[in-house]
């Protein structure tokens, strides 16, 4: 079972993600873990380390709506995943957004940015590689790299 951490400032979107994962059918079970962004990037990174997910999926604009959180979030989803990848290089991270052009422009890796509408099956259509299939694949590739590195060091 893989633990997938989803970070968003909207409670409804966190619930939508849980439902999205529940509807996903695969031989590999996924455990969705949802979290609001914290008001400090360093604290958020510490929180992620404690959760120990197998992948991180974050909304891009974490400070856009203030209905469910009452504090300022001074970073976006790209900032968050890039900061985490400084600690764990090549860790499976993804950013979901309605503003994919903006997120792509601010990201060092355009391949981590996906349109948020996939949570509502509006964008995946007949794609053979669905979003969560890609997440699982990235986790497996990451784990295989770690294992190869361990064998090289042994």
For every predicted segment, state its role.
Residues 2-25:
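Conserved acidic segment of CheY-like receiver
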Residues 7-9, 58-59, 94-99, 115-117:
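Short His-Asn-centered micro-motif
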Residues 20-24, 62, 100:
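Catalytic phosphate/metal-binding cores of nucleic-acid and nucleotide-processing enzymes, i.e., regions
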Residues 33-58, 63:
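Acidic, metal-coordinating helix/loop segments flanking the phosphotransfer/catalytic sites
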Residues 62-76:
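Short, flexible/disordered intra-domain loops and linkers
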Residues 79-86, 90-103:
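A short, hydrophobic beta-strand element within the central beta-sheet of small alpha/beta folds
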Residues 105-126:
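Short, electropositive alpha-helical surface patch
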Residues 140-154:
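C-terminal output/effector regions of signal-responsive regulators
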